[in-house]
């Protein structure tokens, strides 16, 4: 079967890393990128050099209005570059880009993201949570995808992609009565380098490099959409901390069935080695956040960091590269959708 042809709208952090993941995984073909704010020579520079993930281990050049991305042992990608502000005006069909990654962070509703369909795209994958598009987390509920009705879908958030696989394993084996999640989250582009005004909560606008900033996140509640039996049982919040990448979920839950920490470790390791291989990972090493930069997993369970008050009340810890792990799942979701027609 031929690879899915992919277009990327928005060549920011996630857009560029989706392209890196696509090159590395070699399971889809990127044929177009749209970004009205970046010239093609600047795209080459931004893709080649990355302060967090390092220099691209291949070559990137441009020829006219095409980016050429190549890496030894991988398929090369000849990528048409568009510069349209209006998603409906992007001629995705002209390069047979059937699948569009909507990674601007702007067009996150079904109505807004479906504008890509007017230009010839067949499916749109929003790389963010969506208020109304169905959310799919690879390894958790992606098999519920409905090819005949789901033309615009959401890959949920990076935090939901970390939390949901772990919550599924724990709920399937022991049952979750209720739980609270905290994510200690790396800075993102929405934050301010120094104190400035914020459109949401005032403290969101405080300097990202100077502060630990309490923040809201819908990631835990979103798990209830992905795993319906957990709906209303989880909520959470975030602390934004001054690190550039890699975040960590702390999931504190009450269990229906009592479980020792060894019991929990066994089922998580079995899932990581079995049905969730490549999505969920397991480590007993004395790891810290930088150990997971460019890790392609959604969720890496930290066995040594977990604690238990009693067999029904536990705190579980799982790491994630909030940029690269998530971008890998975007590519995986496209690959799965492509097999469903």
From Swiss-Prot:
Subcellular compartments: Cytoplasm
Active-site residue numbers: 158 (nucleophile)
Pathway: Carbohydrate degradation; glycolysis; pyruvate from D-glyceraldehyde 3-phosphate: step 1/5
Keywords assigned by UniProt, alphabetized: Cytoplasm, Glycolysis, NAD, Oxidoreductase
Domain of life: Eukaryota
Catalytic activity, as annotated: D-glyceraldehyde 3-phosphate + phosphate + NAD(+) = (2R)-3-phospho-glyceroyl phosphate + NADH + H(+)
GO biological process: glucose metabolic process; glycolytic process
Keyword Transcription regulation in annotation: no
Transmembrane segments: none
Subunit comment: Homotetramer.
Miscellaneous remark of the record: There are four nearly identical glyceraldehyde 3-phosphate dehydrogenases in C.elegans.
Name this polypeptide is given: Glyceraldehyde-3-phosphate dehydrogenase 1
Gene: gpd-1
């Amino acid at each position: 079967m031929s690879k899915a042809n992919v277009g990327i709208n928005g060549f920011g952090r996630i857009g560029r890393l989706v392209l890196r993941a696509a090159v590395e995984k070699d399971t889809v073909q990127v044929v177009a990128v749209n970004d009205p704010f970046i010239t093609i020579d600047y795209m080459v520079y931004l893709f080649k050099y990355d302060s967090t993930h390092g220099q691209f281990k291949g070559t990137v050049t441009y020829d006219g209005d095409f980016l050429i991305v190549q890496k030894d042992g991988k398929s090369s990608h000849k990528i048409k570059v568009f510069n349209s502000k209006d998603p409906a005006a992007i001629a995705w069909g002209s390069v047979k880009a059937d699948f569009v990654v909507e990674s601007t962070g702007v067009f996150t509703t079904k109505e807004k993201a479906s504008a890509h369909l007017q230009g010839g795209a067949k499916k749109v994958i929003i790389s963010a949570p969506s208020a109304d598009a169905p959310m799919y987390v690879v390894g958790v509920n992606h098999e519920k995808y409905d090819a005949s009705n789901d033309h615009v879908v959401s890959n949920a958030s990076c935090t939901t992609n970390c939390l949901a696989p772990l919550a599924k394993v724990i709920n399937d084996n022991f049952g979750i009565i209720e739980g609270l999640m905290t994510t200690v989250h790396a800075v993102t582009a929405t934050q301010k380098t120094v104190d400035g005004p914020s459109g949401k909560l005032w403290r969101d606008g405080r300097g990202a490099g100077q502060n630990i900033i309490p923040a809201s996140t819908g990631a835990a509640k979103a798990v209830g959409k992905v795993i319906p039996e957990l709906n209303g049982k989880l909520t959470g919040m975030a602390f934004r901390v001054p690190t550039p990448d890699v975040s960590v979920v702390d999931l504190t839950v009450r269990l229906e069935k009592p479980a020792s920490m060894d019991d929990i470790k066994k089922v998580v390791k079995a899932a990581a080695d079995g049905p969730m291989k490549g999505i969920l990972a397991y480590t007993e090493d004395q790891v810290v956040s930088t150990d997971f930069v460019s890790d392609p997993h959604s969720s890496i369970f930290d066995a040594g960091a977990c604690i238990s008050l009693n067999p029904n009340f536990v705190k579980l810890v799982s790491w994630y590269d909030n940029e690269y792990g998530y971008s890998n799942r975007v590519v995986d979701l496209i690959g799965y959708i492509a097999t469903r027609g």
